[in-house]
Amino acid sequence: MSKVINRAVTFINNKTPATITTKELDLDRCFKDTEIVIKIHAASLNPIDVMVHNLAFKLPFNSSPKTFSRDYAGVIVKAGDKVDPEWKINDRVVGNFAHIYGEQGTLSDYLILDPSVQKAIAHIHDTTKLDTKYDPFTLNAAWPLVFGTAHTALFDYGQKLGPDSKILVIGASTSVSYALVHIAKNVLNVGTVVGICSSQSFEHNKAAGFDHLVPYDQGPLTEEVGKLLVGTLRNEKFDLIFDSVGNNDFFPVMDKFLKPKSENSYYISISGDYKNNFNKHPFNISSARSLFRAANPFRGYNYALETLPCKREYMDLGAKLIADGKYAPKIDSVYNFDDYQKAMDRLKSNKAKGKVVIKINGEK
């Protein structure tokens, strides 16, 4: 029987809660010649899911259901005649579905996409080299967006990072920073990666691959990093400062920590000046300040407020590192589809130590 019920977690605007809605889908007619249909087995949540919900203002012409989530892992169940033969029925795939307020999201049973447009897709490879308790779909749903974000910071700003490079990571305990240190060490062979985190997270982050760790809870942050800089690092400044949590401590003293702009050094942020607060409006004066800084041509340093492109490169690399046993995505918790609200509450708590994954359909 070609007709199925497609469940999805949706919302109308920021005054309506997330809820499960259903729609009949004809699997023989729902896709174009250039599209594939993926049965999603697992998806994961990201802060952007909460942010776009909070920004969905109630408007008279905007009453259609909108969907959650971008990361997915599943199986191709249908493929159009013009789809590249690389993508076949029964292939297991993982990806990051790019959308803002779209009719489709990955927190649903089925996803229809054109892989030549939605390029952030790769095949799921063998995961047996990893010491993990998670099935391949749950494991793979946890990495596309965070890995792609880390990859973009390291590769897309014209820097030539390598053994002589030094990177400072603000927020070493995040999933993005975890991915970044793995790429920096296993792919780029970056000589020195310094992480900032709580003193309680030192052991965990040292095992992740950071060369040095600086506590944010034992004194003024710039002073603590400064001690490492003038001591162990012999006053050699950083090629890249990557902020994955939202911080503004270094802007007044940037020249003391970041190499000159002429050497193509960069300060890259994915969160702006302050840590996300899911109980407040996501766009405020601090957001405006970050946007102004990114657009200001008179800065004395290179600054980027990163957005994630839809690219194949980071998907292929992430899948390869997982297959090689060199990268195991961090997972905080796994929820069943019906418990989506508990999963969202966990994300909003800011206490998750890794990705929050939602299982949608069982592995076959």
Swiss-Prot record:
Location of this chain's protein in the cell: Lipid droplet; Mitochondrion
Pfam families linked: ADH_N, ADH_zinc_N_2
Molecular-function annotations in GO: oxidoreductase activity
Keyword Mitochondrion: yes
CDD domains (UniProt xref): AST1_like
Keyword presence, Metal-binding: no
Keywords: Lipid droplet, Mitochondrion
Regions that span the bilayer: none
GO cellular component, one term: lipid droplet
Domain of life: Eukaryota
Main location: other
Family the entry assigns: Belongs to the YIM1 family.
Protein name stated in the entry: Protein YIM1
Source organism of this protein record: Zygosaccharomyces rouxii (strain ATCC 2623 / CBS 732 / NBRC 1130 / NCYC 568 / NRRL Y-229)
